[in-house]
């Protein structure tokens, strides 16, 4: 999620997205959240790292803005070595990478591909590229 991993598979498997999203959000404790991608990556590797193998296509969704926290590139590289491929869907264009608290200039070389995905057309194109 923002600073931690949240399992949402069951909610989305059993409900339409417009119902599942509020269910997931209600489950989260109230408060201020500050993006910490490194912490999220560490939790993901700890909980699910063993499930990532050469059959896995890992898709990371987010803008790569990290509030100047440790980006944990070592964990992205670890996942890339284990997975078939690692792809990043980012709503921001490449010109915004590296501005402010964006770590995308560091993350981009550590993954197999980065696709700008800020609308349905771009999402469709990015998903189509996964199957080429």
PLM region spans:
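Von Willebrand factor type A / integrin I
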Residues: 77-132
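Conserved alpha-helical "signature site"
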Residues: 69-72
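DG-centered beta-turn motif at the end of beta-strands
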Residues: 56-67, 112
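Cofactor-binding loop segments of dinucleotide-utilizing enzymes, especially the Rossmann-like FAD-
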Residues: 1-3, 63, 91
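Alpha-helical scaffolding segments of alpha/beta enzyme cores, especially the outer helices
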Residues: 39, 43, 74-81
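Von Willebrand factor
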Residues: 1-56, 58, 93, 98-99
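Acidic, Ser/Thr-rich peripheral helices and adjacent loops at domain boundaries
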Residues: 10-31, 106-114
């Amino acid at each position: 999620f923002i600073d931690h991993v949240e399992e949402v598979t069951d909610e989305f498997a059993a409900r339409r997205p417009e119902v599942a999203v509020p269910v997931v959000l209600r489950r989260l404790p109230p408060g201020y959240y500050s993006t910490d991608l490194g912490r999220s990556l560490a939790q993901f590797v700890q909980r699910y790292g063993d499930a990532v193998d050469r059959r896995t296509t890992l898709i990371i969704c987010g803008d790569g803005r990290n509030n100047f926290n440790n980006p944990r590139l070592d964990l992205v590289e670890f996942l890339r070595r284990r997975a078939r491929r690692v792809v990043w869907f980012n709503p921001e264009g490449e010109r915004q990478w590296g501005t402010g608290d964006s770590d995308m200039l560091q993350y981009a070389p550590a993954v197999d591909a980065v696709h700008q995905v800020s609308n349905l057309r771009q999402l469709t194109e990015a998903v189509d590229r996964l199957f080429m």
